[in-house]
Curated annotation (Swiss-Prot):
Residues in coiled coil: none
Keyword Hydrolase: no
Annotated DNA-binding residue span(s): 48-111
Species in which this protein is naturally found: Pan troglodytes
Record's subcellular location: Nucleus
Name by which UniProt lists this protein: Homeobox protein TGIF2LX
Superkingdom of the organism of origin: Eukaryota
Bias type Polar residues, positions: 10-39
Family label: Belongs to the TALE/TGIF homeobox family.
Keyword vocabulary terms for this entry: DNA-binding, Homeobox, Nucleus, Transcription, Transcription regulation
GO process terms (BP): negative regulation of transcription by RNA polymerase II
Matching SUPFAM superfamilies: Homeodomain-like
GO cellular component terms given for this protein: nucleus
Annotated signal sequence range: none
Amino acid sequence: MEAAADGPAETQSPVQKDSPAKTQSPAQDTSIMSRNNADTGRVLALPEHKKKRKGNLPAESVKILRDWMYKHRFKAYPSEEEKQMLSEKTNLSLLQISNWFINARRRILPDMLQQHRNDPIIGHKTGKDAHATHLQSTEASVPAKSGPSGPDNVQSLPLWPLPKGQMSREKQPDPESAPSQKLTGIAQPKKKVKVSITSPSSPELVSPEEYADFSSFLLLVDAAVQRAAELELEKKQEPNP
């Protein structure tokens, strides 16, 4: 009886010892699995969190910055005052604006410039503007070279006859010349007549300083007159015989 009593006790003891371990193992497995899933969820959630931190700028702010860059596409380097102005318009910090321009100059600006070159309407407008500026520069330079000449600028014509070819070239009127130039061309012969009328042998123009020969002649005349006066004095002083 004791052996039988001991037998069941011995047979029951392993069951009692093993049963708690078997009943606890599924709970431990589930807890471990839940912990692993939580860890993996955290690991997977990290990139999304980083993406949210890196997030894109607001669309309205980006539009304002792109418009400014397109207007200043040939010199897309805003000054500190312009950055401050853009910061007030876009509600972004100066650091965000600086970083956006650094990236936009590498990624967005080349496409803007290429689109500007390939656009036929913009290219046609720029061509017209360049042609208009060229015409304005030429029109501004022409009056400086061939403006209306005053009386001081009119050159007197030579008194000797000109060759036939030169006379024919001067007689032919220039179709592009202004009326003021035609008037000066008509006034030139009048000046020629005035020059030819003036007599070069007027007494006012003749002076001993201009002609050295006349000065020596005058000296001889003075010496002769002085000698004649001396002879007359000698005759008067001599006693009569």
